[in-house]
Swiss-Prot record:
Gene: trpF
Organism whose genome encodes this protein: Lacticaseibacillus paracasei (strain ATCC 334 / BCRC 17002 / CCUG 31169 / CIP 107868 / KCTC 3260 / NRRL B-441)
Organism placement in taxonomy: Bacteria, Bacillati, Bacillota, Bacilli, Lactobacillales
The protein, known as: N-(5'-phosphoribosyl)anthranilate isomerase
Catalytic activity: N-(5-phospho-beta-D-ribosyl)anthranilate = 1-(2-carboxyphenylamino)-1-deoxy-D-ribulose 5-phosphate
KW Transmembrane (keyword) present: no
SUPFAM superfamilies: Ribulose-phoshate binding barrel
Keywords: Amino-acid biosynthesis, Aromatic amino acid biosynthesis, Isomerase, Tryptophan biosynthesis
Entry GO MF terms: phosphoribosylanthranilate isomerase activity
Known EC number: 5.3.1.24
Length: 199
């Protein structure tokens, strides 16, 4: 069954929503932008999070030492790396016990990446849906992000068969996380898919 990450969590009510809906991963954004939170906020939110939900820190070209400091403070279990990341940097994180998601825009996936997960995204916060049919089927753990909503995630899972789907603005109303949309998204993503075109 596909895993679900709800990203851009900022408030205690966001945490309550992902706890109730049964998300697998919760995303805290440390990179500049409207969802950015501080280490102190992340630690406070993590205390409210169900213990089975793993936390992912989102970074854009952040120095290795700063990411490791956030990990060692106990705020994150996984680092999601946008921008340029070298194999040496990824290995440094992994040797410290931190799992790594490396993000690739559109279909430009580097299968030689040392990361634990490869994410294909339509571009930082663009909200655009990728051309799902152009995404290659790979044997590596793949995360699908960008433009997903409760209305299209089921079809996206069916077409791409990712390990995980990732959503932020697609479960928001007026710029704030919407508990009903989070529940709908997770239900749609995890619903058993019947391949109706197979006779």
């Amino acid at each position: 069954m596909v895993l679900v990450k709800i990203c851009g969590l900022m408030h205690s009510e966001d945490i309550l929503a992902v706890n109730t809906a049964g998300a697998d991963f919760a995303g805290f954004v440390f990179a500049p932008g409207r969802h950015q939170i501080s280490l102190e906020q992340a630690l406070s939110l993590k205390q409210l999070l169900h213990p089975k939900i793993k936390t992912v820190g989102v970074f854009v070209n952040e120095p290795v030492a700063e990411i490791l400091a956030i990990y060692q403070a106990g705020a994150i279990d996984v680092a999601q790396l946008h921008g340029k990341s070298t194999p040496t940097e990824i290995t440094q994180f992994q040797q410290a016990g931190l799992k790594v998601i490396q993000v690739f825009e559109r279909q430009a996936i580097d299968l030689t990446s040392m990361a634990d997960y490869l994410m294909v995204d339509s571009g930082k916060g663009s909200g655009q849906l990728l051309n799902l049919k152009a995404i290659p089927h790979i044997s590596r753990p793949l995360i699908l992000a960008g433009g997903l909503t409760p209305l299209n995630v089921r079809q996206a899972v069916q077409l791409v068969q990712p390990t995980m789907v990732d959503v932020s603005s697609g479960v928001e109303t007026n710029g704030h996380k919407d508990a009903d949309k989070i529940t709908q998204f997770i239900q749609q993503a995890k619903e058993d898919i019947i391949y109706e075109d197979i006779k």
